[in-house]
């Protein structure tokens, strides 16, 4: 007998707080991507994102335009919803995930007709370690 267990994705309960600049359009588009993937998102406009990133401990080399927090994890930049879901399912002993910069055609950075920028989703830890969590090519 083979038994399969289907676990509800954690997206239904996951509350995401997204810190962003008020004028950032791609930050709002990323929030829309998360909402389309069943997350509840609260956008919080911040005047000095650099100070918010410092407060949360986002490494300089991983920074992007917006910084979110979900279930104690930091999500920096245009991280795809599926990688957030994976993070919440696996619950690694990590500080968070990041997509450094603003890769074209990553979630929230869609540009019709433009080629996709390859990018990595990086998992980062309190001790400073950083590893590739997923790659998009």
Predicted features, each with a name:
Residues 31-51:
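Conserved helix-turn-beta segment immediately C-terminal to the redox Cys motif
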């Amino acid at each position: 007998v083979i038994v399969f267990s289907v676990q509800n994705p954690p997206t239904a309960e996951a509350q995401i707080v997204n810190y962003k600049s008020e004028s950032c359009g791609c930050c709002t588009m990323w929030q829309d991507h998360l909402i389309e993937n069943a997350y509840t998102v609260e956008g919080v406009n911040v005047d000095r994102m650099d100070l918010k990133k410092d407060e949360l401990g986002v490494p300089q080399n991983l920074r992007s335009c917006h910084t979110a927090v979900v279930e104690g994890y930091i999500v920096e930049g245009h991280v795809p919803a599926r990688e957030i879901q994976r993070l919440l399912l696996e619950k690694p002993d990590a500080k968070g995930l990041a997509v450094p910069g603003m890769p074209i055609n990553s979630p929230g950075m869609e540009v019709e007709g433009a080629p996709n920028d390859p990018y990595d989703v990086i998992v980062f830890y309190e001790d400073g370690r950083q590893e590739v969590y997923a790659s998009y090519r």
